[in-house]
Regions:
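N-terminal glycine-rich phosphate-binding loop and ensuing alpha1 helix
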Residues: 2-50
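Hydrophobic/aromatic residues located in beta-strands of well-ordered beta-sheets
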Residues: 5, 46-48, 96, 127, ...
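Conserved alpha/beta core of the MobA/IspD/sugar-nucleotide pyrophosphorylase nucleotidyltransferase superfamily
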Residues: 174-258
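A conserved hydrophobic position in a structured secondary element of the catalytic/binding core
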Residues: 50-51, 101, 106, 185, ...
Length: 258
């Protein structure tokens, strides 16, 4: 079994242009993601999946491995699939982990957990954990993708709206979850994903994982206790800077996987 971590990154985000190279404590965001990914145990390779010369120049300067991909890839997962394909990680026993390029504070144990979750279910081709929503303002934030999961550790649905509905929840018993933007795929299943046409729910919600849900493919899903802090808008940088004040992973960034 081989494990590959791919970090998709793109400069042309309409919500936050030039986001990957935004400095956080003097270091570009994607470098934080890359260095943290390199701290994950039992990983054979870590690469960035990019499509722009500016990011390629940054990768050279910062000594980060990368794969150039097609600018026209429709989603981050499709870009990850192209990178995995070019590196030969397409077998059933290959594990490809997608760590989004806007997750600068992702704890390495979360990435390890996503791989373990996939291996727990031999009949499943993809795994994507969730975390509890403790700040109820996130329910109205369309950048935070809300999730519903089954009692059997399967992802039922993803949406940018508040879910489940709390209109009848007079005792405040509802528990809310959001997607963690780290997911794992078996190598052959990731290529199968890339061959599927985008679905209408995927396009309406702007959530690529709905391609699997709408085509009835199970997604292993479990709750993590570690918090992640995605960067969707410029104001999120302040949150990351606060988190980094007590971060234990930054001092370990000098450990690099080849």
């Amino acid at each position: 079994m081989r494990t590959l971590i791919v970090i998709p990154a793109r400069q042309g985000s309409w919500r936050f242009p030039d986001k990957p190279l935004t400095l956080i404590m003097g270091m570009p965001m994607i470098e934080h993601v890359y260095r943290r990914s390199c701290l994950v145990s039992n990983v054979d390779k870590v690469v960035l999946a990019i499509c722009e010369e500016k990011l390629e120049e940054a990768c050279h300067k910062l000594q980060m491995e990368y794969v150039m991909t097609d600018r026209e890839q429709p989603t981050a997962i499709d870009r990850v699939g192209e990178a995995a394909r070019s590196l030969g990680y397409t077998g059933h026993d290959d594990i490809v982990i997608n760590v989004q390029g806007d997750e600068p504070a992702v704890p390495p144990p979360v990435i390890e957990f996503v791989s373990e979750l996939l291996l727990k279910y031999p009949d499943v081709g993809c795994a994507n954990p969730v975390e509890r929503i403790t700040d109820k303002t996130e329910l109205d934030n369309p950048h935070r993708i809300k999730a519903v999961l089954s009692n059997n550790e399967r992802l039922i649905y993803l949406t940018r709206q508040s879910i489940p509905s709390s209109e009848f929840d007079i005792d405040n018993e509802a528990t809310f979850y959001r997607q963690t933007c780290v997911m794992s795929f078996r190598g052959d299943f990731l290529q199968k994903f890339c061959l599927m046409p985008q679905t209408n729910l995927e396009l309406v919600e702007g959530i690529d994982m709905l391609r699997l849900i709408q085509n009835d493919y199970p997604i292993a899903c479990s709750i993590i206790d570690d918090a992640t802090y995605p960067v969707d808008v410029l104001d999120d940088i302040k949150t990351i800077e606060n988190v980094f004040q007590n971060d234990k992973w930054i001092p370990k960034y000098n450990i690099i996987k080849k």
